[in-house]
Curated annotation (Swiss-Prot):
Name of the protein this chain belongs to: Conserved oligomeric Golgi complex subunit 6
GO CC terms: Golgi membrane; Golgi transport complex
PANTHER family in alphabetical order: COMPONENT OF OLIGOMERIC GOLGI COMPLEX 6, CONSERVED OLIGOMERIC GOLGI COMPLEX SUBUNIT 6
Organism: Aspergillus clavatus (strain ATCC 1007 / CBS 513.65 / DSM 816 / NCTC 3887 / NRRL 1 / QM 1276 / 107)
Any single biological process term in GO: intra-Golgi vesicle-mediated transport
Subcellular location: Golgi apparatus membrane
Compositional bias per record (Low complexity), positions renumbered to this chain: 12-25
Top-rank lineage group of the source organism: Eukaryota
Region feature (Disordered): 1-35, 600-630
Length: 755
């Protein structure tokens, strides 16, 4: 922005500070110069930071005034002139406003006068119309009260009063049971319920009269409904999937009267019992005699010769009928949810006199009631079924078929328990028949065992010592029983507790244990202990192979069989070991070396012969645990069994035995039915034989070594006695030959030949 002061102002200002020249005659007087100087000084001393000066300068700059001498001289005048012009214009504007305000005041005065006149007219009109309005208001209030009373009267009559023309729908037997009947009945029930409100007031007469009238109407309606349902039940076809909805609705309504409802159910159960009994009899005997039936369906009685099929067909029919009956009754009583249960619950609450215990909690179980109704419907069928089943079981002697029938009852007991509950008649009937059939099964098994025990020919062991025929037949029957049990339900308990008794344990006690004991007792017919052991082993091996495939059978009976087999195996091992010792001749050497055995050097056994017996056969009377000094091992050469001739004969017998030893040992137990069992017993017997031979070999070597040391010492110590010297030379000659040279076989050779 251009400066308000010209460029030369500074110089002039500076010149003012310089010493003034000499006064001219034309110069102004000194006072004026001082005033101007003071003025300039005050102007120049003003700070540019002053906001007023800054605003003034900005305003001056906005006016676009040029900083000239003329402008500076006229500035004040121009500004004052502008102020005067502005004030004059404002005065003119205020004059115009004053004129307009005067006109507005005149208009307001005119309006006030007009309003006052109107107020006077209104006041006069109000005075004239007030009585008329008061009278009209009173009339309107009276009209509203009359209308309200009329509405209340209409509502009361509509709600509490049943038209006379609708009452015959509930009471007349000629009127049908349809939707109109149920609608009117529902309305009467609502009126009867709402009458309780009328009884809460001071004047109870109207409420009592209406409640009495509605009660009579309801009783008549429920009686009519009860008779109609009984009539419908007589012609009701439960096999028809399209059961009338009206009868289901009638049952729901009748449930509000528990006494009538239960009477109706009793009538229904009696009718269904008769119908199902007749249908069962028809299925048993007259299935093909009907005119419209399926000619391919034969009566159940046609299979009476086969007890299992006969009983199974009857149970299948009963199960099918039970399922159909329950489904039909569910469609009849439970298809609409728990409406009947709610109705019975409400009826029980409204009939406290029907409770046995006044403090008993009122409750109704719809599913239990349905199962009870099905049970009642099948009472006649259950009675007929029980009679026929008991006759069939009593007249049949096949234990396998009898046990299969037991499992049929077991299966259907679980089925009926799920269908009708564990306390239902059919479930209890299945349990009763199951016990009856199993009792018959046990009786049959006992009779068979009794017959076998008196048959000597059947108890005679076979020539090949195999299991007897009657025992094989019993195991075959037992296999059928176990397969039946394994394929049926209810065997999970054996898997959970394999060491405990299970459902099949009583069967084993009846069909297995007696035959096993009878077979084992027949072994007493054999005089030979080896044959007796092999015969008993064959019996137990056959029994074990039969039951081991079934965990529920092996859980309880395999351990005792295994224990008995272990004992027999020990006996057969001793027999086989003795056979090897006797056939090889090693037994004679072991018998001669018994005094040198470590087990005989610690005790002294005193024996005496039995009376009237061979002195060699002795019984041990006492065993004294006294210390016995070990005999001199060199004395073995003096034993009879170790004399050269006897020892050479024994060695020759051993050589003759070894080539066919295994075959001969196996042949000794050839009548055992298990080759694996024979092999294991023979291998252990061979191992025991090798240990015995090793003992004999060690004793022979020890005797040779001991004899050499003793004989040399005896010759050197007694040289003066010629007889003793001569005897020593003979013994030395025998020593040079040695027992080992007479019995050259080694343990290694024996193991190789017997491997």
């Amino acid at each position: 922005m251009a400066s308000y002061f010209p460029h030369g102002a500074t110089n002039s200002h500076a010149s003012m500070r310089s010493p003034s020249p000499a006064a001219s005659p034309l110069s102004p007087p000194p006072q004026r110069s001082n005033a101007l100087s003071n003025r300039l000084t005050s102007v120049l001393s003003a700070s540019y930071a002053d906001s007023d000066i800054r605003d003034a300068l900005e305003t001056l700059s906005l006016r676009g005034i040029h900083n000239t001498a003329e402008t500076r001289r006229q500035l004040r005048l121009d500004v004052q002139k502008e102020v005067v012009d502005s004030n004059a214009e404002i005065v003119r504007d205020f004059g115009t406003v004053a004129e307009q305000l005067q006109r507005i005041g005149a208009v307001i005065s005119s309006l006030n006068q007009t309003c006052e006149e109107m107020r006077q007219h209104i006041f006069l009109a109000k005075q004239d119309t007030t009585p008329v309005l008061e009278e009209a208001s009173a009339l309107v209030s009276q009209k509203q009260e009359s209308e309200t009373k009329q509405q209340l009267l209409d509502a009361f009559a509509k709600h509490f009063i049943i038209p006379e023309e609708e009452l015959p729908v509930l009471t007349s037997l000629e009127e049908p049971i349809d939707d109109h009947f149920f609608n009117v009945l529902a309305r009467v029930k609502q009126v009867h319920h709402d009458c309780e409100v009328l009884l809460e007031g001071e004047n109870q007469r109207l409420g009592l009269e209406l409640m009495e009238k509605s009660s009579r109407t309801l009783n008549s309606a429920y009686q009519k409904l009860f008779r109609w349902i009984q009539k419908e039940f007589q012609s009701l076809n439960l096999e028809d999937p399209r059961i009338s909805s009206s009868i289901r609705r009638a049952l729901r309504v009748l449930a509000e009267r528990p006494s009538l409802f239960h009477s109706c159910l009793d009538f229904f159960a009696e009718a269904r019992d008769y119908a199902l009994s007749d249908a069962f009899h028809y299925a048993l005997t007259d299935a093909v005699s009907g005119t419209g039936g399926d000619r391919s369906v034969k009566p159940i009685e046609f299979s009476a010769h086969d007890p299992l099929r006969y009983v199974g067909d009857m149970l299948a029919w009963v199960h099918s009928s039970t399922v159909s009956e329950r489904e039909a009754l569910e469609a009849l009583f439970v298809a609409d949810g728990d409406e009947i249960a709610k109705g019975i619950q409400a009826g029980l609450s409204s009939e406290p006199w029907s409770r046995i215990d006044e403090e008993e909690e009122v409750s109704f179980d719809g599913q239990k009631a349905l199962s009870d109704l099905v049970n009642r419907d099948l009472i006649g069928v259950s009675r007929s079924l029980r009679q026929r089943v008991e006759l069939v079981i009593q007249g049949h002697d096949d234990p396998v078929s009898c046990y299969k029938i037991v499992h049929l009852f077991l299966f259907y007991r679980a089925t009926f328990s799920k269908l009708l509950g564990p306390q239902s008649n059919l479930t209890e009937l299945m349990e009763t028949l199951e016990k009856f059939a199993f009792t018959r099964f046990e009786r049959i098994m006992r009779e068979q065992v009794t017959v076998l025990s008196s048959d000597h020919s059947a108890l005679t062991p076979p020539e090949d010592l195999s299991a007897p025929e009657f025992f094989l037949d019993a195991l075959e029957a037992l296999t059928s029983l176990m397969k039946t049990h394994d394929a049926s339900l209810g065997t999970e308990d054996a898997d959970r507790a394999p060491a405990a008794e299970n459902q099949f344990t009583p069967v084993l006690r009846a069909a297995f244990d007696p035959y096993l004991e009878l077979a084992r007792s027949s072994a007493t017919e054999l005089q030979d202990a080896t044959a007796r052991a092999m015969y008993t082993t064959n019996i137990l091996l056959t029994a074990r192979s039969t039951i081991s495939a079934f965990p529920f059978a092996s859980a309880t009976h395999l351990p005792p069989i295994s224990t008995a087999l272990s004992d027999l195996r020990t006996d057969l091992l001793g027999i086989q070991h003795r056979y090897l010792l006797d056939a090889s001749g090693l037994g004679l050497l072991l018998t001669a070396l018994e005094p040198f055995s470590p087990s005989t050097t610690t005790t002294i056994t005193t024996t005496k012969p039995k009376p009237d017996t061979n002195p060699e056969d002795t019984d041990t009377d006492t065993t004294l645990p006294t210390k016995k000094p070990p005999p001199n091992i060199a004395a073995i050469a003096t034993l009879p069994a170790f004399q050269p001739d006897a020892l050479i004969a024994t060695s020759q017998q051993l050589d003759d035995f070894l080539p066919s030893a295994l075959m001969d040992a196996t042949e000794n137990l050839k009548r055992l039915q298990s080759a694996t069992f024979v092999k294991s017993v023979t291998e252990e017997a061979v191992e025991a034989f090798c240990r015995d031979f090793e003992f004999v070999e060690g004793m022979i070597i020890g005797a040779d070594e001991a004899a050499g040391r003793v004989d040399i010492a005896r010759v050197d110590g007694d040289g003066d006695n010629e007889a003793e010297i001569h005897e020593g030379e003979e013994l030395k000659l025998e020593q040079e030959m040695g027992l080992r040279r007479l019995f050259p076989r080694t343990t290694g050779e024996i193991r190789v030949l017997l491997s």
